[in-house]
A protein has these predicted regions:
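Active-site-proximal substrate-binding groove within the catalytic cores of carbohydrate-active enzymes
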Residues: 2-268
Length: 268
């Protein structure tokens, strides 16, 4: 196994101050063979409880080789090991959820969480087209990052609506005060009781807006005004997302500021 840290981009040294400040732990890369054996142990335990739902944090997300000269494994070989393991899980009747969704793993997944829905972190990009989600929609269920852990909760919700993504939350049962002064304060907004009402309301809104679309392809994605985007699904149903801080009129239908709504398909 190999222990890794966050690194200072200037000094190229392990940045303990950054790690402490951002509450990040060091983490480990393990031998690919050990990782696959660990999956078997995990799946056996889960199946033992009568469940066939398997969630993966690293398989399908993190890809690393093993460069020990006594037992060298290339990244390509590690990829093949992951694919074979995912194939085995599907053949065993399991439903598989993966994180992020590397292309080689997506065909074997039933749900992908933490998919990157937004490229605007790159300042030179003026506009973006959601090619990846357009290609996958109707074939696999996916979501962006956890709504309640987002830097901008509303932006996350709007981007999920524009991309035809599902909703994803991270919860804990304990009061978040138990995390104070610990390594996991990034989960400060995860108490289930605090989010239960808002979660139910948001799920109901998504279910009503996107009813009948999750198994349909995205036929068209277009910018219809500054800060306003329209996604049209197979069959004609469309959703307009308004990122602006003022209301928008679409064919006589008012789309509230920082909100989204289902509209009739067709031209504006």
């Amino acid at each position: 196994e190999c222990e890794l840290y966050n690194w200072d981009p200037i000094t190229y040294q392990a940045n303990d101050d950054y790690t402490d400040y951002h509450n990040y732990d060091s983490y480990y890369l393990v031998k690919p063979s050990y990782a696959m054996d660990s999956v078997d142990t995990y799946v056996e335990k889960v199946n033992g409880y009568g469940s066939k739902n398997i969630g993966m944090e690293d398989i399908g997300n993190t890809l690393a080789g093993d460069y020990n000269p006594k037992d060298r494994v290339s990244r390509e070989a590690a990829l093949n090991l992951q694919v074979k393991k995912l194939q085995s899980l599907k053949q065993g009747g399991n439903k598989v959820m993966i994180t992020s969704g590397n292309q080689y793993a997506v065909p074997y997944a039933d749900f992908v969480t933490d998919m990157n829905l937004d490229a605007r972190a790159v300042n030179i990009i003026d506009e973006q087209v959601p090619f990846y989600t357009m290609a996958l929609h109707g074939l696999i269920n996916y979501s962006g990052g956890a709504i309640n852990l987002a830097d901008d909760e509303k932006e996350n919700i709007l981007k999920s609506a524009e991309s035809g993504a599902g909703l994803y939350f991270t919860y804990i049962a304990e009061k978040t005060s138990v995390l104070q002064d610990g390594k996991y304060t990034r989960y400060y907004a995860c108490n289930y009781d605090d989010w239960k009402k808002d979660t139910l309301s948001l799920y109901n809104k998504f279910n009503e807006t996107f009813e009948g679309t999750y198994d349909k392809a995205i036929d068209k994605h277009e910018k219809i005004a500054e800060g306003v985007y329209k996604t049209t699904f197979e069959g004609g149903k469309a959703v307009v997302v308004n990122y602006n801080y003022s209301n928008y009129q679409y064919n006589g239908q008012e789309i509230a500021a920082r909100d989204f709504a289902a509209v009739k398909g067709g031209e504006e």
